[in-house]
Swiss-Prot record:
GO terms for cellular component: cytoplasm. It comes from Bacillus pumilus (strain SAFR-032). Its EC number is 2.3.3.13. InterPro entries: 2-IPM_HCS-like (IPR050073), 2-isopropylmalate_synth_dimer (IPR013709), AIPM/Hcit_synth_CS (IPR002034), Aldolase_TIM (IPR013785), LeuA/HCS_post-cat (IPR054691), LeuA_allosteric_dom_sf (IPR036230), LeuA_bact_synth (IPR005671), PYR_CT (IPR000891). PANTHER family: 2-ISOPROPYLMALATE SYNTHASE 1, CHLOROPLASTIC-RELATED, HOMOCITRATE SYNTHASE-RELATED. Keywords: Amino-acid biosynthesis, Branched-chain amino acid biosynthesis, Cytoplasm, Leucine biosynthesis, Manganese, Metal-binding, Transferase. The gene is leuA. Its main location: cytoplasm. The keyword Ribonucleoprotein does not apply. Its cofactor is Mn(2+). This is 2-isopropylmalate synthase. Belongs to the alpha-IPM synthase/homocitrate synthase family. LeuA type 1 subfamily.
């Protein structure tokens, strides 16, 4: 059976989603989860774009052992050199080099002729091949490129040493039949096409990214470029989880297989959602909360009699546990450690001790601790280790229907260890909290977005708040989890500011590194 490779671009194209700004530690956590998921290639970033991206890609390449790590580059020597330096210590360094090929891009962006683009593409693929064992070449805006010219340039970059040819629908324009026909055309008109793997990269501007990717597979594509939860620039990329499950459930039709560990899908989706701040819609295929819910009476009756009447995907297949085991205040360290292992977390003894303490504190407020609660604890604590910015200490809010809400907040400056306490009012309780926090902080902060959802079920479910703020003209997302909505709101705000300060700290370190070197 033919094998389909999954090239995941969550950390590169996915991070280009508006409002998403992952720090290096968060990217590494996501990369490790993608490795557990079983993707074949992780596109970790664009090393030449910034020193921060370079170091992030380098760390991921040095850490990941069970799949290839790729970096993006333009057809420019400087980009290729930067990518090699970032990736050379990886298991299988892979370059993803691209140049636009459509007439509209050649005329308005590159200001080059077709002949000049062919010459540049061939020269840079040859240059890259001197370093990289695997070179993937992309024809940016392939779907609006003249097919005869596309076939010509593809043939020449294959002769230059490309191992993978990517034909992206950069603007999400084509219908599935049209996109599939491009792969068919390449198969029929490029003499050396059998020497390479063909790759599909689809955007969801017209809602057809997954359908187009599957059409590419039907017409000979060997690799699919995806992002977890379908995140990405504009309307997003093809959703990894939807394609992986479709290929599995309809193996009879597609006759292909992959290395994706389907039972890791839900946790991967949760990890990406929590760190990116992009909430998964309830009706999202495969990973949405409603994906396995049945409300219609007729559907419920049939489902209870025989699941397969209305359920083609079992929750267990994608890692949605139906295990009702819960932990509580009487659960010991061993039970906690065992549950962490069951959930797939590999923790050191030091981490277990720290997380167990957080867990015990939560049991004083919440009777039953679910898997969702545990995952939230781990994800929040894992990125709270760097002692930069502010530590949230306490919050008190006074509210009455006929009174102006007043908040009192205590924060600790983690650099000076000074405890800062302020009070302020607001039109509502959340505004009062945020006005108070701003009085505690030196930064000028503008709140752009505020979202809240429950984590788990029941009246004692944890509140999960996501905010997007602008500081010094830069957007940063923050996340906070607590049993109380106002505490979660405060933590999300502090988290966003701390992420901004960590980003600034990283830039300072990078500038110091440049000065030394």
């Amino acid at each position: 059976m033919r094998k389909i490779n999954f090239f995941d671009t969550t950390l590169r194209d996915g991070e280009q989603s508006p409002g998403v700004n992952l720090n290096a530690q968060e990217k590494l956590i996501i990369a490790k989860q993608l490795e557990r998921l079983g993707v074949n290639i992780i596109e970790a970033g664009f090393p030449a774009s910034s020193r921060g991206d370079f170091l992030g890609v380098q760390e991921i390449a040095r850490t990941i052992k069970n799949c290839s790590v790729a970096g993006l580059a333009r057809c420019v020597k400087g980009d290729i050199d930067a990518a090699w330096e970032a990736l050379k210590d990886g298991v299988e360094p892979r370059l993803h080099v691209f140049i636009a090929t459509s007439d509209i891009h050649l005329k308005h962006k590159l200001k080059k002729t077709r002949e000049e683009v062919v010459e540049q593409a061939v020269a840079m693929v040859k240059y890259a091949k001197e370093r990289f064992p695997v070179v993937q070449w992309s024809a940016e805006d392939a779907c609006r490129t003249d097919l005869d010219f596309l076939a010509e340039i593809v043939e020449k970059v294959i002769d230059a040493g490309a191992s993978v040819i990517n034909l992206p629908d950069t603007v999400g324009y084509l219908a599935p039949k049209e996109y599939g026909n491009i792969f068919k055309y390449m198969k029929e008109h490029v003499p050396n096409i059998d020497r390479v793997n063909l790759s599909a990269h689809c955007h969801d501007d017209l809602g057809m990214a997954v359908a187009n990717s599957l059409a590419a597979i039907e017409n000979g594509a060997d690799q699919i470029e995806t992002a977890v939860n379908g995140i990405g620039e504009r309307a997003g990329n093809a959703a990894l989880e939807e394609i992986a499950v479709a290929l599995h459930i309809r193996k009879d039709f597609y006759q292909v297989e992959s290395t994706i560990q389907l039972n890791e899908i839900k946790r991967t989706s949760d990890v990406v959602s929590k760190y990116s701040g992009m909430i998964v819609p309830r009706n999202k295929a495969v990973v949405g909360n409603n994906a396995f819910a049945h409300e219609s009476g007729i559907h419920q009756d049939g489902f209870l009699k025989e699941k397969t009447t209305y359920e083609i995907i079992s929750p267990e297949l994608v890692g949605v546990t139906t295990d009702v085991l819960v932990l509580g205040k009487h659960s010991g360290r061993h039970a906690f450690k065992d549950r962490m292992k069951t959930l797939g977390f590999k923790l050191t003894e030091e981490e277990i001790n720290k997380f167990f303490e957080t867990f015990k504190n939560l049991t004083e407020k919440k009777k039953e601790i679910t898997d969702d609660d545990l995952i939230s604890i781990i994800l929040e604590e894992k990125v709270a280790d760097r002692k930069i910015g502010y530590e949230f200490e306490s919050l008190q809010v006074h509210y009455g229907t006929e009174q102006m809400p007043t908040a009192t907040v205590s924060l600790k400056n983690q650099e000076t260890q000074e405890v800062i306490q302020e009070a302020a009012t607001g039109a509502g309780s959340v505004e009062a909290v945020y006005n108070t926090l701003e009085r505690c902080m030196e930064e000028r902060i503008h709140l752009l977005d505020y979202r809240i959802q429950s984590n788990g079920k029941g009246r004692d479910a944890l509140a999960e708040v996501y905010v997007t703020v602008s500081i010094e003209g830069k957007e940063t997302a923050g996340r906070g989890v607590a049993q109380d909505v106002l505490e979660a709101s405060a933590k999300a705000y502090v988290n966003a500011v701390n992420r901004h300060l960590i980003f600034k700290s990283n830039l300072i370190e990078i500038e110091k590194h440049h000065a030394i070197s």
